[in-house]
Amino acid sequence: MNMIMKTLALSFLMAQVLVSCMIENPENKLFDISGDEPVANYQVIGKVTDVKGNPIAGIRVIADYSTGMPYLADTLYTDKEGRFSKFMSIPRVDKFVMSFTDIDGNANGGYFESKFIEVNPVRTEMASGHFGGSFIVSAEVELNKK
């Protein structure tokens, strides 16, 4: 009998916990975590040079595609030709905030100032159904020495 009471009490507590964990949004609809937001393909590409046009290797490029809430970004690094490239499939966004930072100090041509720019994706393929389309995010950046 004691075991039956413990089982019933535990079941009652579990039901209370599950009900209290429900998250609702302002429209009084249950929070949607099913991933129904269309996903788009983005090809982030570009080149970083100094003011004389020489490529700069080892520059950290952060492609921030946050749309308000959680900070969402990908980190890339320039190669010996100053180029960076990354393919990503993410929910549809209208802009990327790109940052370019010299993280290796005097190596690769000296100390360079950081730079921040906004880039609007350019559509290369139309959306269809659950597919949000394809886009290119391109940036050619010159960095000044410090």
Regions found by a protein language model. Give the residues of each.
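Short Pro-Gly-centered beta-turn/loop motif in secreted/extracellular proteins
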Residues: 85-97
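Structured interaction patches on ligand/partner-binding surfaces of diverse proteins
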Residues: 103-136
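Sec-dependent bacterial lipoprotein signal peptides
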Residues: 1-21
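Beta-strand-rich domain onsets/edges
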Residues: 22-43, 47-52, 145
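Short, acidic Ser/Thr/Gly-rich low-complexity loop/linker segments typical of extracellular
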Residues: 69-83
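Conserved "repeat-terminator" motif of extracellular CCP/Sushi domains
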Residues: 38, 132-146
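Short, ordered, surface-exposed loop/turn motifs in non-cytosolic proteins
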Residues: 44, 50-69, 90
